[in-house]
Regions:
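Metal-dependent nucleic-acid phosphoesterase active-site entry motif
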Residues: 1-23
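PIN-domain endoribonuclease scaffold, especially VapC-family toxins
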Residues: 2-8, 27-97, 107, 111-115, ...
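Conserved residues at the C-terminal ends of beta-strands
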Residues: 120
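Conserved glycosyltransferase catalytic-site signature
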Residues: 12, 44, 102-103
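Generic structural "secondary-structure junction" signal
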Residues: 17-21, 48, 100-102, 126
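Ca2+-coordinating acidic residues in Ca2+-binding motifs
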Residues: 123
Length: 140
C-alpha cells in the first residue's frame, strides 16, 4: 500500500461540505477530516469561495472561520511571482473555464511540490501539475 501523502491542498468543495450538513459530500468531508493525518493546506481564495457558497448560513460561515482559526488548515498565499503562472493557467483552461481559486490551488501545488489535492471539482481530473502530471485527488 502506498504511503499516504503528508500534505495536500484543499479546494473549496470539501470545506463547503464539511460545514453544510445538507451537502451531498458532508459525511465524506467529516470522515476525511477525522481520518486525515496529512497537513491540510489551503488559501484565502478557497476560503472566500467557500464563504460565498455558505452565505445563507451564518453558523456554517462562523464554524468554517473558527475551524481555520483553530488550525484546521494551514493557509498559504500566492506570492507575486505566482500571478504570472495563475494567469497562464486561467488562459490555458479558459474553455472550462478555470476560476481564480482553482488557478491559485494549481499554482501553489506547483510551487510547493504538491501533487495531491482534496476537491469535488471534476476539473482537477483535467488540470495538470506543471502541465504534465495528473493531480491525485484524495477526496473523491
Amino acid at each position: 500500500m502506498p504511503d499516504a501523502p503528508r500534505k495536500f491542498i484543499v479546494d473549496s468543495g470539501p470545506l463547503i461540505a464539511l460545514f453544510d450538513a445538507d451537502d451531498h459530500y458532508h459525511r465524506r468531508a467529516l470522515e476525511f477530516v477525522r481520518q486525515s493525518r496529512a497537513k491540510l493546506i489551503s488559501t484565502m481564495a478557497v476560503i472566500t469561495e467557500a464563504m460565498y457558497v455558505l452565505e445563507d448560513s451564518l453558523p456554517a460561515r462562523r464554524n468554517l472561520l473558527t475551524w481555520v482559526q483553530s488550525g484546521g488548515l494551514t493557509l498559504t498565499e500566492p506570492e507575486l511571482d505566482d500571478f504570472e503562472r495563475i494567469m497562464e493557467l486561467i488562459e490555458k483552461y479558459a474553455d472550462l473555464p478555470m476560476d481564480f481559486a482553482d488557478a491559485v490551488v494549481v499554482a501553489l501545488c506547483e510551487r510547493l511540490g504538491i501533487t495531491h489535492v482534496a476537491s469535488v471539482d471534476r476539473h482537477f481530473a483535467i488540470y495538470r501539475y506543471k502541465g504534465r502530471t495528473k493531480f491525485i485527488n484524495v477526496f473523491i
